[in-house]
């Protein structure tokens, strides 16, 4: 379900916990804990593996914080970037920032130390924050796809207003907060005795009922279906119809041709965002599904390492989006450059071209005004 305190923590034997977490240790009374067999040592305790994990997580955090902060900054700063679609994109960036700043540092610490040293409050907060952010991202990507489908496929003249877009964003966070709440509620911060007089602090899922409760499995499978499979199905259907419409559309006039090309490029960019999100989260979702179906997966020697690698792959989606925006969208590329140069206006770059194009656009709009006007407006990102 989340990176902190999975069912593995509760199902390991005392000997397995001792071997994986520590290696040679002494008890508070000075008794030596026997050295574990080399083949039993958890790989995440090896120095070279820990160095790789530190580099991976720190790189994701650094790239994510810089990239997502930049996206939010340019959408707020430049008036021409304040479109409905860009507000939704900025919301994705906020969700990714939550993961970068509130989840990943503590997840890395927990993975390296083998026990939860951050206290009971963060034990409940960190898994909840990650679940919340992922669900916000999924809902936002679905809303973007449905909005573009509505405008482009059906040629609707009325677009979502900025006020309505803020309402949708608020609802996305509210719904996600409710759906992710079990991750905070059904959690236990406790001491686990490894050997007599030797304990570690654990942060684990604790569902009501028996020790191996079905509630956790039901929640995990429901989340997979409602917040991954179903949204991706809706998004795939929407973008398939959008792409079909764009390929079959014939625009009269040079200005409309230009906007048609922009629509295609923007659609490609947003499809790539969805693909990156879906592919990066697929291994972790599949692995969690395997755990839910067969709990013996928890007994794998390298369970923790496999889970950590899949978690790192999933977290790559938190910094990939700004790279895609800068690579595939000229408006974002110009906005990023303007922000780095501390320029106050976005049109400071290629300003003469912008003025000329605006004049041509106004002339073409007067000549070609008609039922396709809404189609032309649909994807100004």
From Swiss-Prot:
Designated name of the protein: Neuropeptide Y receptor type 2
Keywords: Cell membrane, Disulfide bond, G-protein coupled receptor, Glycoprotein, Lipoprotein, Membrane, Palmitate, Receptor, Transducer, Transmembrane, Transmembrane helix
GO cellular component: plasma membrane
Cellular location(s): Cell membrane
Sequence ranges on the Extracellular membrane side: 1-51, 108-124, 187-216, 290-304
Membrane topology (UniProt): Multi-pass membrane protein
Similarity remark: Belongs to the G-protein coupled receptor 1 family.
Database matches in InterPro entries: GPCR_Rhodpsn, GPCR_Rhodpsn_7TM, NPY2_rcpt, NPY_rcpt
Disulfide-linked positions: 123-203
Function: Receptor for neuropeptide Y and peptide YY.
Entry-linked Pfam families: 7tm_1
Cytoplasmic side: 73-86, 146-165, 238-268, 326-381
Cytoplasm found in the keyword field: no
Entry GO MF terms: neuropeptide Y receptor activity
Transmembrane helix is among the record's keywords: yes
Region (Disordered): 1-35
Glycosylation sites recorded in the entry for this protein: 11
Transmembrane segments: 52-72, 87-107, 125-145, 166-186, 217-237, 269-289, 305-325
Originating species: Macaca mulatta
Lipid-linked residues (S-palmitoyl cysteine): 342
């Amino acid at each position: 379900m989340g990176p902190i305190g999975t069912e593995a923590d509760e199902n390991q034997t005392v000997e397995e916990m001792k071997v994986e977490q520590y290696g040679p240790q002494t008890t508070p009374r000075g008794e030596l804990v026997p050295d574990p067999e080399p083949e039993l040592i958890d790989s995440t305790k090896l120095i070279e593996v820990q160095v790789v994990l530190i580099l991976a997580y720190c790189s994701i955090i650094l790239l994510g914080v810089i990239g997502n902060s930049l996206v939010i900054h340019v959408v707020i700063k430049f008036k021409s970037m304040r479109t409905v679609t860009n507000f939704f994109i900025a919301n994705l960036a906020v969700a990714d920032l939550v993961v970068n700043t509130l989840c990943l540092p503590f997840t890395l610490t927990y993975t390296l130390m083998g026990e939860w040293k951050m206290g009971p409050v963060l034990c409940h907060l960190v898994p909840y924050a990650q679940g919340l952010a992922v669900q916000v991202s999924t809902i936002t990507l679905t809303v973007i796809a449905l909005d573009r489908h509505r405008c482009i496929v059906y040629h609707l003249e009325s677009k979502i207003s900025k006020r309505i877009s803020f309402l949708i964003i608020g609802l996305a966070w509210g719904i996600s907060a409710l759906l992710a709440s079990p991750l905070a509620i059904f959690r236990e911060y406790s001491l686990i005795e490894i050997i007599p007089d030797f304990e570690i602090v654990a942060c684990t899922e604790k569902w009501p009922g028996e020790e191996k409760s079905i509630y956790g499995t039901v929640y995990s499978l429901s989340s997979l279906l409602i917040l991954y499979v179903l949204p991706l199905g809706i998004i795939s259907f929407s973008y398939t119809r959008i792409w079909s419409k764009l390929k079959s559309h014939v625009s009269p006039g040079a200005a409309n041709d230009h906007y048609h090309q922009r629509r295609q490029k923007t659609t490609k960019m947003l499809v790539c965002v969805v693909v990156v999100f879906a592919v990066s989260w697929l291994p972790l979702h599949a692995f969690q599904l395997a755990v839910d179906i067969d709990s013996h997966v928890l007994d794998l020697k390298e369970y923790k390492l496999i889970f950590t690698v899949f978690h790192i792959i999933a977290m790559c989606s938190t910094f990939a989006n700004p790279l895609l925006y800068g690579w595939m969208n000229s408006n974002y590329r110009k906005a990023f450059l303007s922000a780095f140069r501390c320029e106050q206006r976005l049109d400071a770059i290629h300003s003469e071209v912008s003025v000329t194009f605006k004049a041509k656009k106004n002339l073409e709009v007067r000549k070609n005004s008609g039922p396709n006007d809404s189609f032309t407006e649909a994807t100004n990102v």
